[in-house]
Amino acid sequence: MTVLVDSDILIEVSRGRNAGIVAKWMDLSDSDAAVLYSPVSVAELWAGARPSEYDALRNLFRALKCTPIDEEAGRQAGDYLRQYRRSHGVEVADALIAASAAGNRAELWTRNRKHYPMKEITFFD
């Protein structure tokens, strides 16, 4: 199994405030699953972090595998934007994360399912 972790989950894990998510994170970490993140999530978390949180974020990302955003992912994200931007308000960041999940055949772990109306996306529960 491959799981791509969305920014909202990474925020919860890094701050440790949601016991349910942290417990699920620990179970996932102890499993054989490949756990991925997108560079989009790095940008989102870094932009909202305080300097005192930088080391913890670096350590969090070191424990995971970064999935690249290549040309194919860019085209897929563009297709998602064309299809869902007006009808569902999908933004560039979410389109890129969705394209990365689809391209890696990864389940997406997010609490913001409404941001991902794409039929190709399967969710991690």
Residue ranges and their predicted role:
Residues 1-2, 98-125:
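Acidic, PIN/NYN-like endoribonuclease modules and their adjacent C-terminal/linker elements
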Residues 1-37, 46-62:
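Short, well-structured N-terminal submotif of metal-dependent ribonuclease cores
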Residues 5-6, 37-38, 90-91, 112-113, ...:
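Histidine- and aromatic-rich ligand-binding microenvironments
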Residues 6-7, 45, 77, 101:
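Generic structural signal for small/hydrophobic residues in well-ordered secondary structure
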Residues 10-11, 42-45, 74, 116:
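A generic structural signal for short hydrophobic patches within well-formed alpha-helices
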Residues 20, 65-111:
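Active-site neighborhoods of divalent-metal-dependent phosphate/nucleic-acid chemistry enzymes
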Residues 52-56, 84, 123-125:
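Short, hinge-like loop/turn segments at secondary-structure boundaries
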